Amino acid sequence: MKRSGIFIAIGLFCLVSSCGDRDRQVEEALSLSGNNRNELEAVLKHYEGDGRKLEAAHFLIGNMPGSYGANPIVEQDCSAFYEAYDSLGQKYGYRVGTEWGKQVDSLWKDFSNRHRVRQELNYDITRMKAEDLIREIDLAFRVWVENVHSRNCSFEDFCEYILPYRRQNGLSIDNARREFNKRHQGKYFVKEGKDWQQEIDSLLYEYKYLTHSGFWGTKIPIWNAATLEKMRHGLCAQRCWYNSLLLSSLGIPVAIDFVPAWGNRNNSHTWNVVLINGESHAFEAFWDNDRWKYKRIYNNRDDDELWGRFRLPKVYRYTYSNHIEGPLADVEVDKADIPELFRSVKKVDVSSEYFETADVTVELTGEAPQGVKYAYLAVFGYQDWHPVQWAKIENGRAVFREMGKDMVYLPVYYKRGGLLPAAEPFRLRNDGTMEKLSGNEETEEVAVRMVTGAPAYDQNREYLGCMKGSRIVGLLDGKSEEELCRWTDSLALEPVVRK
């Protein structure tokens, strides 16, 4: 089945299955499996008479449409590159730095220009083998019982956070979880009286050598845990699925949360979350001396003395189960008219687990393009606006649910990849009221006080010395006119907190 065809089929499947029971959902999934149907039916037959495992198999197969990964052939295509990359890493002692990074980017650019890298997608529903799925189900049930911290979690949490073999779309299916379990079985999470958080820290400390790449080599394909271990460096999103594979292989209910765009900074971010005793506990994916800080610094209220101010418009959680809603559930909406964030069925909104939210009603004063039925709230970053929530247009207004406070939003329409203003931008205050930001012809002086967002980053400390000996001069007609300032020593960097 072609890629476009299977996406259409998955959309129709989700619409049908959301109204039926699990048996109907499974049957609809099997109808999409093509020549792979016998493999999936073999799993169901294998667990006949074992109620819980059969129900787990139903969950995995019923939600399998929409799950996909890289064709493992990409590893073969890139094997020579990975060897060259490792040699370069040895040269620099596997340390991330500017010279190393430039050579990594150059190495990948040269390799990808000279070699074919087949980054094709495999859909789980047409590729998953019975033997592999049975092994994953049996492993999940075994580690669930063995783990003293999670053995009493609900079956629903087990299915969503321990059971799934796929922790995020795009990864190739392999034996990573079985390998992780073989490495650590019996060492962690099996003795009563131990603190589960400290045990997780101890386990992740064993993988402290896996560090952030500093955004070098971002286009290099890393589609499985073994490749990330070989490369030693990656992005937050990659370390998150790695941790999710690792922890779930030992029975820890774990997921991946993300902010699609910051409300007061550039970029986005991804991190891990553990779900124990009905509560979620977020933590930094890479090794950090204060890794469990996110519920504290992502509360949309405080300014952290060390990390500065974070404002989050939304937090979503990747799921294995399918959740179709909004424009994606509307058969009258062309998929091309839906922002990429809302084309995925594998996520849920968990904003309220992190901060107080507010429902926002917006009067849409901008004319909507023909056929547009939904509006979006967007935040600004990297010189552009990024949609973070949707709402259906009704009588010229839209109600956006559970929005983060203390940041600026722009209501927009989305049509064929383009954004159009739907109303004036506004600031959502801490008390949930809206302050419209209307432009006019008046001008006035503005004094700007710059407060660094993350004052203690190691790189910032490193660069402070570079200012020594620098001077600032005023220019007149392109010629130096007057020296305004000279630094005779290194700068100091002091955290400033707004009260």
Kindly give the residue locations of the regions a language model identified.
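Bacterial Sec-dependent N-terminal signal peptides
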Residues: 1-25
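Sec/Tat-exported extracytoplasmic proteins
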Residues: 36, 207-211
